[in-house]
Amino acid sequence: MNLLPKIDWGKIERFIGSLKFAVIVISLFTIGMIIGTFLESYYGTDFANRAVYKTPAFMMIQFGILLSIIFAAILRLPPKKRLYGFYTIHSGLIIIGMGSLITYVAGVDGQITLAPNEPNRQVILSKDIIKITYPTEGKQITSFLPFSAFKTSLNETYDNISIKEYIPFAEGKFAWTDPINKYPADAQIHSSKYHFKNAFAEQDLTLSIHPEAGQEFQSTLTMGPLSFNYYPASLAHCFAQNNPSKIILWNSVTAECFTPEERHLVIKTTGANNRFVVLPYNNSFLTFFPDFSPFPMDTKLQTDEKSIIRAFSKKLFEEKPNLFLFGKQAAWYSKSENKWVLKDLALKGASVTLPWMNAEITLTDHQDRLVPFNIPESTIPIQKNGSLIKGDIRAVRLEILGKEYWVTNYSPLSLLIQGKKVVIEATKEALTLPFELAL
């Protein structure tokens, strides 16, 4: 006894190849394209792809159009001379549809950046991935993240790392967080928030030298002609010294600083009148040309960028507006007084007047140990002039040994898990070409 209903395949074939079905799928396709066009205009191409163009529903509509074309041609077989134009047009549409399907399944969708005279062979693909690297073991795990437009819950585990949530478009909510790793008690890892204003604008700034601070919290910042430079607090007293050479030497590990005058070091000049200073260090000598580079020169006159001893020439920062911040202190060069000035910044206290454009700066928050972090929150992106001005953060929430961590495209995570160093990144899949391209 046959319990399955009898299917009239001929009726299904006639319906798919009918004008009625064609009108339905083309209408749905048109509606999807209209919605996608508006989304792409306001929220960006990536959001439109995730929300409309590359969703299973929209793909099924396009597949329905392809089936409609195929069955419309089949229903008009065997060939008739008066339909040769119909067969030609529909054959072309079928070829285009099959080509689009092959491109979607086996094609590569990505971008390659070509700077002038700089060859490149790496293509950044559209697929989001989370990359877990064990540097000491030379092992790397790559997991693909869902191609979704909104927050998605996940439940994937690798070793002791659980992937809990993925947010393709997020904005950061500022918070101070505890550091992941341990640091010496005297480590210079502070961060500060300032409020800057002048006659034309005002802005809140967050600067940090904490090694765990993300890319959005740097130690340098430029606002028009004015540059902000954030340094360890222990360097402030060296800036306050108006020593004749205007050179500072410091240890980048201990953040200790001194001037050549304090160590009775002689400033010499070359035949081309370039200043240099020689520092005895660890049974050897370090030669600095501070007006050209903070790093010492070796015997082959190559800079040693691995050296922990650096030299700083204050002369280089006297012509243009440069503000040096040391947490609770600020320094700048005063042309009217012809000297460097150091001022204290009281936490949430009175503002300090700067010598440029009637500018003022106020210290609004300062943390010696905590890390500045933008906790990701799901949002709808906003596009302006071809780039995202909101929602440009891609974030993954992890759970590692009972603790919650966030990894974003701006802030990779580096920590020890049961004695093993692990680096976790949220990034895009990359493809290396077998050849180079250049402009």
Please tell me what each predicted stretch does:
Residues 1-6:
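Short, membrane-interfacial amphipathic segments enriched in basic
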Residues 7-26, 85-93:
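Alpha-helical transmembrane segments and their helix-start/interface "positive-inside/aromatic belt" motifs
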Residues 16, 20-23, 27-30, 65, ...:
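Hydrophobic, lipid-facing residues on alpha-helical transmembrane segments of integral membrane proteins
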Residues 18, 55, 70, 91-92, ...:
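Conserved structural-core and active-site-/substrate-pathway-adjacent residues in large, well-folded domains
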Residues 21-81:
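Membrane-embedded alpha-helical segments of integral membrane proteins
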Residues 56-128:
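Internal alpha-helical transmembrane segments
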Residues 112-439:
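Soluble non-transmembrane domains of integral membrane proteins
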